Amino acid sequence: MASLQLCDGYLLFKPSVSPRFLSQRISHRLIPKASSSPPPSPSPSSSSSSLSFSRRELLYQSAAVSLSLSSIVGPARADEQLSEWERVFLPIDPGVVLLDIAFVPDEPSRGFLLGTRQTLLETKDGGSTWNPRSIPSAEEEDFNYRFNSISFKGKEGWIIGKPAILLYTADAGENWDRIPLSSQLPGDMVFIKATEDKSAEMVTDEGAIYVTSNRGYNWKAAIQETVSATLNRTVSSGISGASYYTGTFSAVNRSPDGRYVAVSSRGNFFLTWEPGQPYWQPHNRAVARRIQNMGWRADGGLWLLVRGGGLYLSKGTGITEEFEEVPVQSRGFGILDVGYRSEEEAWAAGGSGILLRTRNGGKSWNRDKAADNIAANLYAVKFVDDKKGFVLGNDGVLLRYVG
């Protein structure tokens, strides 16, 4: 499932480190990747205690030669025992925030990566390397588009962005066509999901949901009114912070069966919608702190993140207002997203390179130190399947799951 967190980013590199390099312990688990050429060979690790002194000396000399010829600067600091990710360097400006990623089901090695500053990258090797793609119809205008969401079904794909732009492909992304949109669209498009042949579902940050079945040339409303209209019409709903509501969504997530959960812009309540319902259903938050993000667990339940680093799981499955807090080691940094690799294993990511993993369905979480030296916010965790996953961050940070 895809999500969008509208959060401010931080600088990726510490002042003392050149943007071209990242200091880390050399490990087969966390390997810097270059988009245009293979990375330099890693230096040998330290020898085991069973090796003789002469063998140890030979390894040290080899390491010195290797490091002098490579572009890696300084000692490695990643924790190789916990690391399940590798850094993939991208051919983009440092200030770009990565927002979404998707792969073509009919061509599993081919995928696309979106971001701010009209960023569109393509991979044909499963995400190891990426190359820039351009959209001529978008470049003809003076706008600097923010591509928010992408989705594929078969070889058909959709991209939406801000200012309002809709792109469609029928050939796995080889060509992208610009689809005209109504200027009366309420809010900014933040999410799109390819559903069936020539069909998609689109959501705006004001809660409008539209569906199309003819490649986007006509859209039909799946909901009768925007969230603000619903809340202001039902002032006596008992939802804290909902009266005279004029805000937007700060996050929206879709379950595989088409249900939505969204967070109000101020984080003081959340909303849900199921296919067939005429309106969004508002819910009081069950925690004291404001909500940062929400989404769906692999078992059909909900996860909830609060500002400041708290993580909660709903009791049971389905939509509910009952949540239980789960202890996490976030070092005081906020957790921004959760992505499930399987029903039992999930990863959480957040500020200052925080990566957490659970192997028991969320009952306990352990910190992976792989990204500790990446001074960036990690905004989104995306698993295409149990072998292909990515973490997206600000300043062009992309981590690839290597297991």
Curated annotation (Swiss-Prot):
Expression in green tissue, not roots. Disruption phenotype: Seedling lethal when homozygous, has pale cotyledons but never develops true leaves. On sucrose-supplemented medium PSII is completely inactive; D1, D2 CP43 and CP47 are present in very low amounts. It comes from Arabidopsis thaliana. This is Photosystem II stability/assembly factor HCF136, chloroplastic. Residues 1-53, 54-78 form a transit peptide. A 7-bladed beta-propeller torus, about 54 by 55 Angstroms, with a depth of about 25 Angstroms and a central pore. Essential for photosystem II (PSII) biogenesis; required for assembly of an early intermediate in PSII assembly that includes D2 (psbD) and cytochrome b559. Has been suggested to be required for chlorophyll a binding. Interacts with PAM68. InterPro entries: PSII_CF48-like_dom, WD40/YVTN_repeat-like_dom_sf, Ycf48/Hcf136.
